[in-house]
């Protein structure tokens, strides 16, 4: 049965990069059939899997061809490792609601039964730290059963992670969605690992993996590839391989207990964290 995973995190934290490298590792190292559904108006959730190509989004296709003609063969592309890729896209700048686009795109994919076709994992890569109605849809309506939050040892990344947990709690009991853990995408700040471990303990989850900072990630992006495609034997590829394995084998799913603002302030002061 396909496992549906939503990846959340503060804008600029490296969420899409982490998600694409994890998906690539699942396919390349673990032989899984994977699909990525980008839920960000920037439509950059699949770029590294498709060799740097910005694919035509579902919303663009809907505007151009109409709903009847917006079929899976028009909007799904296959990239590295046989990974299926689709981007929701969004409205024209300054017009309409991008969250509404996410709802429309996911509903349309479900109607065509796309998420059930020979897949092991579907990743929903969701816009930044916005937990408004549309972007909360993977959580609210049970479209995703598992959530992983990408964070770092920086103050705003932790605040965003805590806010996402608050949004989760609101919908967890009705939708059945659960938090699978925090992925630390390291920024090399002092005491980062210890801070993230304490944060995870306080909200009742696990730090599923600590991804070290490595310039090969940027080098691979410059070459329009995931790290796994660029150099599958390098240390960073092995980190993503391990993260993928931990997600595949994960059984530790919880409804988090978000911290209060006062508790968050105490935590960042304790570790001397500044952005």
Swiss-Prot record:
It holds the Pfam family Fer4_NifH. GO terms for biological process: nitrogen fixation. The keyword ATP-binding applies. Its cofactor is [4Fe-4S] cluster. The keyword Oxidoreductase applies. Binds 1 [4Fe-4S] cluster per dimer. It catalyses: N2 + 8 reduced [2Fe-2S]-[ferredoxin] + 16 ATP + 16 H2O = H2 + 8 oxidized [2Fe-2S]-[ferredoxin] + 2 NH4(+) + 16 ADP + 16 phosphate + 6 H(+). InterPro entries: NifH/chlL_CS, NifH/frxC, Nitrogenase_Fe_NifH, P-loop_NTPase. The reversible ADP-ribosylation of Arg-100 inactivates the nitrogenase reductase and regulates nitrogenase activity. It is an enzyme of class 1 (oxidoreductase). The modification ADP-ribosylarginine is found at residue 100. ATP binds at residues 9-16. Keywords: 4Fe-4S, ADP-ribosylation, ATP-binding, Iron, Iron-sulfur, Metal-binding, Nitrogen fixation, Nucleotide-binding, Oxidoreductase. [4Fe-4S] cluster binds at residues 97, 132. It comes from the Archaea. Its EC number is 1.18.6.1. The key enzymatic reactions in nitrogen fixation are catalyzed by the nitrogenase complex, which has 2 components: the iron protein and the molybdenum-iron protein. Homodimer. Belongs to the NifH/BchL/ChlL family. HAMAP family: NifH. This is Nitrogenase iron protein 1. It comes from Methanothermobacter thermautotrophicus (strain ATCC 29096 / DSM 1053 / JCM 10044 / NBRC 100330 / Delta H).
